[in-house]
A protein has these predicted regions:
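Intrinsically disordered, low-complexity Ser/Thr/Pro-rich tracts
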Residues: 14, 18, 107-109
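Intrinsically disordered, low-complexity serine/threonine-rich segments
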Residues: 9, 26, 36-38
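N-terminal secretory signal peptides that target proteins for export/translocation
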Residues: 1-13
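Bacterial N-terminal signal peptides
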Residues: 17-30
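Glycoside hydrolase catalytic-domain context in secreted enzymes
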Residues: 32-431
């Protein structure tokens, strides 16, 4: 509103007193009308944006855009962590992306446990692995909605699974090699597709859960040096050995998320590699989901004991987002994205790239049906009693039997009649 300056001649002290009395009242009344209008407009704007992003009749892209456009820079940056906080004024609930499902729903109470990934790879059975992943996603959905009904929202209760691990197991010193499907690129690619399809479901509208292909790329231990390793790889080895499984995950399974690795590839941190994240993942493969860092990987950019590729957390955060990393897994000193606001102010990064990252993240949550009525989401009705059901337990026994491989028969088979087997240890009677 345009401000006016009043110039009224005052003849007497009485008039002066009257003018002094009335003028503050006029200012006060004007001030009321000025402050109320913007407040009402802002409230109406927020209500309209809420109506838009919750309107299931609108295209998904329009709903997400309405939500992101209504957020402040600080709110958007806060959503770029695995433990994204609630935005109460917009009705956005808190969400933690951290969950695992390599061979069963992890860390969320009891669940059916299948053999570790390296064992399931030994089955050489795409269809059965897909069935196993379907069981895992059934149980994950059932658990998620049970938590939701109780008002519980915490780490490991979500629907974004940081699985499968489709790295190539080349180095026997890698203590987590059992999480992979082994050292064969073809087998790993085929099984990765089967597992991802089982996790994500086959509905045309909604994701059952969101799978994450990890760790992109050339990551295979040993663990002790994973934060500082620099793997120098030829194009031939990169494209024939380390990348095929990721290409299949994107092209054949439409995987929703990719986790970038701790290590450097040809001198560049994987989570800051334009070659990996822009040129290969998005341009060559056509990936349109979100990219998240392994936990603490962005801090490795400037950590003297790690890559020390840059000196400041702000530069590291801007570098990662500029290269295409959308989500930072990290807390405390590892939470480098806390410096993104400073990076925007200093011109290290444009806010439009923050918008792009947050849009990708919310697209995943919307695809999972998190902002729609449960009645619209087909997977929301999976009963909790499916968790650990007899059918699922029978499948895990079958998987265990199929995973056993005898490399050399030194008189072991056939088993002699009457032989006794001792089962020793605290889990001997654990179903």
């Amino acid at each position: 509103m345009k401000q006016h300056t009043f110039k009224t001649p005052v003849a007497t002290a009485v008039k002066k007193g009257l003018a002094l009395t009335l003028f503050p009242v006029a200012l006060m009344l004007t001030g009321c009308s000025q402050s109320q209008a913007p407040a009402n407009q802002a409230e109406q704007s927020v209500q309209q944006q809420q109506a838009d992003y919750l309107n299931t009749a609108l295209p998904l892209e329009d709903r997400v855009k309405a939500l992101v456009d209504s957020m402040t820079l600080e709110e958007k940056i806060a959503q770029m962590y695995n433990d994204a906080p609630a935005i109460e004024r917009l009705g956005v609930p808190a969400y933690d992306y951290w969950n695992e499902a390599l061979h069963g729903v992890a860390r969320a109470g009891e669940a059916t446990v299948f053999p570790q990934a390296i064992g399931m790879a030994a089955m050489w059975d795409r269809e059965f692995l897909n069935d196993i992943a379907t069981v895992i996603s059934d149980e994950g959905r059932a658990k998620h909605h049970a938590f939701k009904a109780q008002g519980i929202s915490y780490r490991y209760a979500g629907l974004t699974y940081w699985s499968p691990n489709i790295n190539i197991f080349r180095d026997p010193r890698w203590g987590r090699g059992q999480e992979t499907y082994g050292e064969d690129p073809y087998l790993t690619g085929e099984l990765g597709v089967a597992f991802i399809n089982g996790l994500q479901g086959d509905d045309d509208t909604y994701l059952k859960t969101a799978a994450t292909a990890k760790h992109f790329a050339v990551h295979n231990g040993p663990e002790i040096t994973r934060h500082s390793d620099n793997y120098v790889v030829s194009d031939k080895d990169l494209y024939e050995t380390y990348l095929p499984a990721f290409e299949k995950a994107v092209v054949d399974a439409d995987v929703e998320a990719v986790m970038c690795a701790y290590n450097r590839v040809n001198g560049m941190p994987a989570c800051g590699s334009d070659m990996l994240l822009k040129d290969i993942l998005r341009a060559e493969y056509g990936f349109d989901g979100h990219v998240m860092s392994d936990c603490g990987a962005i801090a490795d950019f400037y950590d003297r004991k790690a890559h020390a590729s840059t000196r400041s957390p702000a530069a590291a955060a801007a570098w990662a987002v500029n290269s295409g990393t959308d989500l930072n897994c990290g807390v405390g000193t590892l939470s480098s994205f806390a410096n993104l606001s400073f990076a925007v102010q200093k011109g290290f990064i444009d806010e439009s790239l923050i918008d792009q990252a947050v849009t990708r993240l919310f697209m995943t949550r919307f695809k999972l049906g998190m902002f729609d009525p449960d009645s619209s989401v087909p997977y929301a009705s999976i009963p909790l009693d499916s968790v650990g059901s007899q059918e699922h337990l029978s499948m895990t026994q079958q998987a265990s039997e199929k995973s056993l491989v005898l490399l050399k028969n030194n008189g072991v088979l056939p088993l002699k009649p009457g032989i006794k087997v001792a089962v020793i240890g605290p889990n001997g009677d654990n179903q």
